[in-house]
Structure formats: C-alpha cells, structure tokens
C-alpha cells in the first residue's frame, strides 16, 4: 500500500491534486480541507491509502492519521464505499464523525451527501463501538487558503456538488450565497461551506 507521498504539487482541482514524486505524477483524491492546505509548486507530504478494484487503482489523501483511519472504518459499513467515505470526511472531521456516531445523531449524519436515514442508522449500529478511539478533532483553519475568482468558483463548486449527487437547482443558490458572504474564499472553502448548508437542508 502507498501510505504517503512527498513531492511537488503540480496541480490542484476541486476533488484531487497531482503530486510529482521522483518524476512520476500521482493523482490523489482528497477532501476540500486537505486540498486547501496545498499550493502549486510547493513540496507537500500527504498521507494516502490505495483503493484497488478490478478496473482501477485510486489514491486517496488525508491531512491526518485519524482521517485516514476513519476512511477505512467507514467502509466496513455494508454498502458504503470510498466515494461516500470521502464525502463524509468532506463534511465532518474524523472526530466530529465519531461524536455523531457515538451520540447516535442520525440527523447530523444525514448532512453527508448520499447518506439518508437508513444509511445513518447503519453507521450508528455498525460503528458505534468502533469509533470510540477517535478523539474529537479541532476545527480546521480554512482562512489561510488562497482566494479565487468568484465566477469560476461558483461554476466549479456547482459542478462538484452535482458530482456528489445534488441537482443544479439545489446547489447553485447555496453556492452563490456562500460566495456572496465570502467573496475572497478559495474554492475548497466554498465547497465545504456549501456541503454543510446543503446537508442541513436535508
């Protein structure tokens, strides 16, 4: 398993970054919070896990060991794959997820895109005892992320939310509202804020 990568950040997109290590570019899928810590042209070290399927090999990147461990724990739930596990960590940290699961906060878990009442109940039932080891995580400081132009940000974030299962009609007003309140916010910051608001409306 590829447990970590250290190299130069070549590219940063809405859902992934490309790190060049020893002349090889690795595409790493990650949460908005993790992507917000990277800067093009600078060296970075990213904790990773490799998910191997019959037709693909995908790298996922994390800001902390807890997030990576939670990524694996979430996938022990029947019917929950890496895409949904990453979506969960895009909305809440490992510590916050652990609190919600241990506290049987089904409504809070339903803020995660793709998680309805039944999946939330399965998370609680199957993981309540497994998440006790996760300490509450401090809120990530997203204010240091580089600013981006508001126009492209709206379109990019709406596109990312549609990819997560939201409709344009649901996503666009929320994204535009977030950008209006935080006109200098970077794309990962806007995406995370929009995810939180959309989850609260479910």
UniProtKB/Swiss-Prot annotation:
Residues 149-202 are annotated as: Domain III. Residues 64-142 are annotated as: Domain II. Coiled coil: none annotated. SUPFAM superfamilies: DNA helicase RuvA subunit, C-terminal domain, Nucleic acid-binding proteins, RuvA domain 2-like. Residues 143-148 are annotated as: Flexible linker. Disulfide bonds: none annotated. Its main location: cytoplasm. It holds the Pfam family RuvA_C. It comes from the Bacteria. GO terms for cellular component: cytoplasm; Holliday junction helicase complex; Holliday junction resolvase complex. Keywords: Cytoplasm, DNA damage, DNA recombination, DNA repair, DNA-binding. Residues 1-63 are annotated as: Domain I. The keyword DNA damage applies. One of its GO terms (biological process) is DNA recombination. The keyword Cell division does not apply. Has three domains with a flexible linker between the domains II and III and assumes an 'L' shape. Domain III is highly mobile and contacts RuvB. Homotetramer. Forms an RuvA(8)-RuvB(12)-Holliday junction (HJ) complex. HJ DNA is sandwiched between 2 RuvA tetramers; dsDNA enters through RuvA and exits via RuvB. An RuvB hexamer assembles on each DNA strand where it exits the tetramer. Each RuvB hexamer is contacted by two RuvA subunits (via domain III) on 2 adjacent RuvB subunits; this complex drives branch migration. In the full resolvosome a probable DNA-RuvA(4)-RuvB(12)-RuvC(2) complex forms which resolves the HJ. Belongs to the RuvA family. The RuvA-RuvB-RuvC complex processes Holliday junction (HJ) DNA during genetic recombination and DNA repair, while the RuvA-RuvB complex plays an important role in the rescue of blocked DNA replication forks via replication fork reversal (RFR). RuvA specifically binds to HJ cruciform DNA, conferring on it an open structure. The RuvB hexamer acts as an ATP-dependent pump, pulling dsDNA into and through the RuvAB complex. HJ branch migration allows RuvC to scan DNA until it finds its consensus sequence, where it cleaves and resolves the cruciform DNA. This is Holliday junction branch migration complex subunit RuvA. It comes from Corynebacterium aurimucosum (strain ATCC 700975 / DSM 44827 / CIP 107346 / CN-1) (Corynebacterium nigricans). The gene is ruvA.
């Amino acid at each position: 398993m590829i447990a970590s990568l250290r190299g130069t950040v070549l590219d940063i997109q809405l859902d992934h970054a490309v790190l060049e290590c020893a002349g090889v570019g690795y595409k790493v899928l990650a949460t908005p919070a993790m992507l917000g810590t990277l800067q093009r042209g600078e060296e970075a070290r990213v904790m990773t896990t490799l998910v191997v399927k019959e037709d693909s090999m995908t790298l996922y990147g994390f800001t902390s060991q807890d997030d990576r461990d939670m990524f694996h724990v979430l996938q022990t739930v029947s019917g929950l794959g890496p895409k949904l596990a990453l979506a969960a960590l895009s909305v809440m940290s490992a510590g916050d997820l652990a609190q919600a699961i241990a506290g049987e906060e089904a409504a809070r878990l339903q803020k995660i895109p793709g998680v309805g009442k039944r999946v939330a109940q399965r998370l609680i039932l199957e993981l309540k005892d497994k998440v006790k080891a996760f300490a509450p995580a401090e809120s990530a400081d997203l204010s240091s992320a580089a600013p981006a132009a508001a126009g492209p940000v709206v379109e990019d974030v709406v596109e990312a939310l549609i990819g997560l299962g939201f409709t344009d009609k649901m996503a666009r007003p929320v994204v535009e509202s977030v950008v209006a309140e935080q006109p200098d916010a970077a794309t990962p910051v806007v995406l995370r804020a929009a995810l939180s608001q959309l989850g609260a409306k479910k």
